[in-house]
């Protein structure tokens, strides 16, 4: 009789701990931790462009200053991509270039798709 009570109590404790873990998971998943969520909002950068303008004005460049990276280059199409680990730079041929997401394509595949789109084939 005692062993059945111990088993029942053990099963009840196990069930309660699993339920507690589940509720904590859903609470965090759906934003229940309001104090933590509020803390994230106070750490966000301002949504105005003042910080960018300050960096732009403080950059010394006697050539072309790339707007996306603030790199100083000879020509606009020489601007590097802001995120080269996930973007490919494709030169369009008229002295301009675009940075596009690699998106899991094979090397050169994104550039090929842009060329097909420019020709109206895609």
Swiss-Prot record:
Gene Ontology terms: biological process: ERAD pathway
Signal peptide start-end: 1-21
Keywords: Signal
Claim: Transcription is one of the keywords in the record: no
InterPro entries: LCL2
UniProt xrefs under PANTHER family: LONG CHRONOLOGICAL LIFESPAN PROTEIN 2
Protein purpose: Probable component of the endoplasmic reticulum-associated degradation (ERAD) pathway.
Homology family: Belongs to the LCL2 family.
Protein's UniProt name: Long chronological lifespan protein 2
Organism: Neosartorya fischeri (strain ATCC 1020 / DSM 3700 / CBS 544.65 / FGSC A1164 / JCM 1740 / NRRL 181 / WB 181) (Aspergillus fischerianus)
């Amino acid at each position: 009789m005692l062993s059945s009570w111990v088993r029942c109590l053990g099963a009840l404790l196990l069930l309660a701990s699993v339920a507690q873990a589940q509720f904590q998971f859903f609470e965090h998943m759906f934003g229940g931790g309001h104090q933590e969520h509020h803390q994230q909002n106070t750490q966000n950068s301002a949504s105005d462009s003042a910080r960018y303008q300050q960096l732009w004005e403080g950059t010394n460049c006697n050539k072309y200053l790339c707007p996306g990276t603030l790199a100083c280059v000879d020509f606009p199409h020489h601007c590097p991509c802001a995120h080269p680990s996930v973007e490919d730079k494709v030169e369009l041929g008229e002295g301009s270039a675009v940075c596009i997401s690699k998106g899991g394509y094979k090397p050169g595949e994104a550039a090929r798709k842009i060329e097909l789109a420019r020709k109206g084939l895609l």
